[in-house]
């Protein structure tokens, strides 16, 4: 399941993200963070970390450097 989600995220990075421009307020980007989370922790924990990161990605959060721990 993780590999399927990584493929979807990669498709997003290749085809959709360039159309939107650079909008992520974090480094690494949320999609790169997600791929790292799935590769490192697998499906369940990777999904949890991805959702937690996406919930922080809004205009009222300062963003910045937020690596995978």
From Swiss-Prot:
It comes from Alkaliphilus metalliredigens (strain QYMF). Its main location: membrane. GO terms for cellular component: plasma membrane. Belongs to the UPF0161 family. Keywords: Cell membrane, Membrane. InterPro entries: Membr_insert_effic_factor_YidD. This is Putative membrane protein insertion efficiency factor. It comes from the Bacteria. It is a peripheral membrane protein. It is found in: Cell membrane. PANTHER family: MEMBRANE PROTEIN INSERTION EFFICIENCY FACTOR-RELATED. Could be involved in insertion of integral membrane proteins into the membrane.
